[in-house]
Amino acid sequence: MKFGIVINVSRERALELARKLVSWLEAQGIGYIFETLSAERIGSALSAPIEELNTQCDAFISLGGDGTLLFTSQHSVTKPVVGINVGYLGFLTEFTQEEMFDAVEKVIKGTYTIHTRTQLEASVPADGRNEQFLALNDVVIEKGTYPRIPAFVIKLDGELLSSYRADGIIIATSTGSTAYSMSAGGPIIAPKSSVFVITPICPHMLTVRPIVISDEKIIEISVEAPDGEFPLNCDGHLRRMLEPMERVTVRKSIRLINLVANENRDYCEVLRTKLLWGREHNSGL
């Protein structure tokens, strides 16, 4: 058994936990290897680029917040990922710092359970081939620095859904429904729901609302504008700039993310404690 370890190197507490984890793994006779930048900060010679880490380990440990987990998941392929929260919100990271050793031990013993999460795949035709990008949370196309309001034309399975005049469009998974989409007015969707949500950003129409669709639908998006460049972001990372009328196709990826589940963690409780769901002002609930 060998673990691939990814650290949010900007957090000193994450580095401290990584050192404790290494000592514990060595005492157990368990192998490990760090992502390159993490290895540099921790002072370890055992490292590999994040793109190669999944070929050299059996499972991943993410030490950081939700952003670190998203980064790790993009490269984990089908390997299980243990998310240890050393961040601010920790909505996706299943385990607290105090639960780290117990969680890792369950993976070593093979007594863990998995939460399987759907990913989005965004593809853009370029130079005779398709550029493809994956996202666990969301794919976002924005107007960027374009000074006017462009129209985002959306088709579902080749049929026109609508043309949205807005600052951008968010395509989110059920996992990503509590991220950018929620901030833009989208609904909260239970994690195992087989749906996507299309959420416009600041639409210039009172009648426009987010729409929930089957995750079997193929979504095509293009930006109608006379000029300009429009950012295509996947899980908060800029992937490329789009030209007017350049088509982006978004669909369910065949690659799933396997997150090691915390059996003591209830999704409804997470909504209440992390997002203060349903909490009244001055309520003790």
From Swiss-Prot:
Subcellular location: Cytoplasm
GO biological process: NAD metabolic process; NADP biosynthetic process
Keyword NADP included in the entry's annotation: yes
Enzyme class: transferase
Binding-site residues, NAD(+): D66, G67, N137, D138, R148, R165, D167, T178, A179, Y180, S181, M182, S183
Catalytic activity: NAD(+) + ATP = ADP + NADP(+) + H(+)
InterPro entries given in the database record: ATP-NAD_kinase_N (IPR017438), ATP-NAD_kinase_PpnK-typ_C (IPR017437), NAD/diacylglycerol_kinase_sf (IPR016064), NADK (IPR002504)
A Pfam family annotated for this UniProt entry: NAD_kinase_C
GO cellular component, one term: cytoplasm
Cofactor(s) essential for the protein: a divalent metal cation
Keywords: ATP-binding, Cytoplasm, Kinase, NAD, NADP, Nucleotide-binding, Transferase
GO molecular function: ATP binding; metal ion binding; NAD binding; NAD+ kinase activity
The family this protein is said to belong to: Belongs to the NAD kinase family.
Function, in words: Involved in the regulation of the intracellular balance of NAD and NADP, and is a key enzyme in the biosynthesis of NADP. Catalyzes specifically the phosphorylation on 2'-hydroxyl of the adenosine moiety of NAD to yield NADP.
UniProt protein name: NAD kinase
